[in-house]
Amino acid sequence: MTAGGVMYSDYALGGFLDAASREPWFDNTVFVITADHCASSAGKTEIPLEKYHIPAMIYAPAFVTPGSVGKTASQIDLMPTLFSLLGMDYDSWFYGRDILADDFRERAFVATYQDLGYLEGDRFTVLSPVDRAEQFLLRPTDDDPYALERTEAIDSTHLNRAISLYQTSSQWNKR
């Protein structure tokens, strides 16, 4: 997205929230605002991490104290986090986790139409068709915060975690 696109989105969102704030239902409303990966990453076979770094915002002035979180997470973590912010006690069927919990493990799930990626810490595993797997180390630079370096050896613990997370989510979805 261009700078102009970001500025317009910011303007439009601000106008929407300003108009909503004058409505009688505003104090009883939670706004969850997020994005999807950018259009230029759709259909690609490689997984460009920088195109999957997206914003998310939970806005509910009557319920949620303003703050900022700089953790690596995924969209699946939004609802568990929201329920936690609202103080809701519930039995979780969510695959995501509350990103504000002390035991939250920072990780991200990213995918293209063929490849599945799993980022945890500085290790990025890419699962591809026909039992192919690659691993990379995240090596940020001043010019590229998402620079990846292919590893020679596969970390089997990280590989097995990536496989098990995607397999269990697939099986769970078939129930």
Predicted feature locations:
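Solvent-exposed soluble domains appended to multi-pass membrane proteins
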Residues: 1-175
